[in-house]
């Protein structure tokens, strides 16, 4: 991403707004992200839209800023360790939908519409202090007395801005916070007063408690969702930001079947979303069931710390059913992906077409979805409470997809 490209993205993004309007821009804090931030600000102002520069903050804090300050949208410049990227938000602080992104992309290719008068330019200002407001919101959503009277240690590995938000919130409660820079993920925790958490660049969370108990992202989502379900309609982090969504929880379609059943036993209806956190946030807002602890990594970690103190986390982790998964991938031509997925769906019953195809099979389940990577076209993930059955189920669907791929080759030969 070059500054010129960032300027054009900012202009294309702002050209969609009805004037008068304002949009916010924030960077994750690295030097290159700051350069791109000011380029995007210039692009927004070039279209007559007022541009607000926000100090370095986490993506969740910036999303909260856009939502609470009347902005028509926002741009977050994120340096994920590989390449800088621009994440575009709507007026609700939710990542733009694919339809809106196509509109921005068309504007980017067309080029910015330059004004004829200086008076038509937007004003660039500063919008600060919202990160502190976001931290206060996290503090207001937990049982402070419980946290203050039961001080613990959090060992955390996370993107810089997310780690700072979480650290400041917990330090106010008297907790010890240790930053972890381990490249190989979590290590076991043998101190009963310590919890270790890892947040990756996609917002997925894993945690370690009490010896070799390590929970992956699906397990973390399940224990949080179960806690929300038990306290539905009240309690810390139990209420959605918009009233009326107390009976619904939006979870990824990849959530294993036993975990789904565990949550539904609490009397909550589950709505299934695509895998990405952005899609989960978008659907939860649309269904009026936005729970910060499920869709914001910072809120999730604070919630997990509260559950750790109350004993809920250990109880829920021990009660989780044991799940085994097996994963494989196959390659095929890009033009055949849609055809193969459609043919597979037509030959199966009771499939869920969300983010690919999900099927229930006896005591197991299988997800088949486009991989979206250069070295694989399809990703097949099978699961069961029996490890051998999970492997067998995965092999069965790899074979089915292979036959579909080869049958098309035979027709063309």
Ranges and model annotations:
Residues 2-11, 83-193, 237-240:
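Gly/Ser/Thr-enriched, mixed-charge loops and adjacent short helices
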Residues 4-8, 20, 31, 35, ...:
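Conserved active-site and cofactor/substrate-binding residues in soluble primary-metabolism enzymes
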Residues 7-14, 41, 45, 63, ...:
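Predominant activation on well-ordered alpha-helical scaffold segments within soluble catalytic domains
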Residues 8-11, 15, 19-86, 168-213:
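N-terminal small/polar loop signature for handling phosphorylated ligands or for N-terminal nucleophile
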Residues 21-29, 152-158, 247-253:
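Short glycine-rich phosphate-binding loop at a beta-alpha junction
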Residues 90, 94-110, 214-231, 271-274:
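Short, acidic/small-residue loops that bind anionic groups at enzyme active sites
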Residues 201-202, 211, 222-413:
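Phosphate-binding and adjacent anionic-ligand microenvironments
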């Amino acid at each position: 991403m070059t500054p010129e490209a960032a300027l054009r993205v900012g202009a294309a993004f702002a050209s969609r707004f009805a004037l008068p309007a304002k949009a916010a821009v924030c960077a994750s804090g690295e030097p290159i992200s700051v350069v791109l931030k000011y380029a995007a600000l210039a692009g927004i102002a070039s279209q007559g839209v007022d541009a607000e520069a926000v100090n370095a903050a986490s993506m969740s804090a910036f999303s909260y800023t856009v939502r609470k300050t009347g902005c028509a949208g926002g741009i977050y410049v994120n340096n994920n360790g590989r390449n800088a990227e621009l994440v575009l938000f709507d007026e609700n602080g939710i990542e733009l939908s694919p339809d809106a992104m196509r509109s921005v992309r068309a504007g980017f290719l067309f080029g910015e519409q330059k004004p004829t008068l200086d008076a038509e330019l937007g004003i660039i200002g500063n919008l600060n202090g919202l990160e502190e407001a976001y931290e206060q919101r996290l503090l207001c959503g937990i049982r402070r007395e419980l946290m203050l009277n039961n001080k613990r240690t959090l060992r955390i590995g996370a993107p810089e801005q997310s780690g700072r938000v979480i650290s400041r919130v917990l330090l106010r409660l008297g907790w010890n916070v240790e930053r972890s820079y381990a490249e190989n993920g979590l290590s076991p925790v043998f101190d009963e007063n310590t919890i270790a958490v890892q947040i990756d660049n996609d917002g997925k969370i894993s945690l370690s408690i009490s010896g070799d108990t390590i929970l992956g992202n699906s397990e973390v989502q399940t224990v949080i969702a179960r806690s929300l379900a038990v306290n539905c309609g009240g309690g810390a982090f139990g209420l959605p930001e918009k009233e009326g969504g107390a009976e619904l929880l939006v979870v990824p379609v990849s959530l294993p079947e036993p975990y789904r059943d565990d949550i539904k036993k609490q009397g909550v209806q589950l709505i299934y979303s695509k895998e990405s956190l952005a899609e989960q946030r978008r659907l939860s807002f649309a269904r009026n069931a936005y729970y910060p602890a499920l869709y914001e990594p910072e809120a999730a970690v604070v919630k997990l710390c509260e559950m750790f103190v109350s004993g809920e986390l250990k109880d829920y982790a021990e009660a989780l059913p044991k799940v085994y998964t097996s994963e494989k991938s196959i390659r095929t031509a890009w033009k055949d992906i849609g055809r193969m997925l459609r043919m597979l769906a037509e030959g199966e019953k009771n499939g869920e077409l969300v983010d690919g195809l999900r099927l229930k099979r006896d005591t197991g389940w299988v997800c088949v979805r486009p991989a979206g990577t250069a070295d694989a076209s399809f990703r097949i993930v099978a699961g069961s409470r029996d490890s051998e059955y999970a492997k067998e189920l995965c092999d069965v669907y790899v074979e089915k997809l292979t036959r579909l791929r080869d049958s098309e080759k035979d027709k063309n030969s």
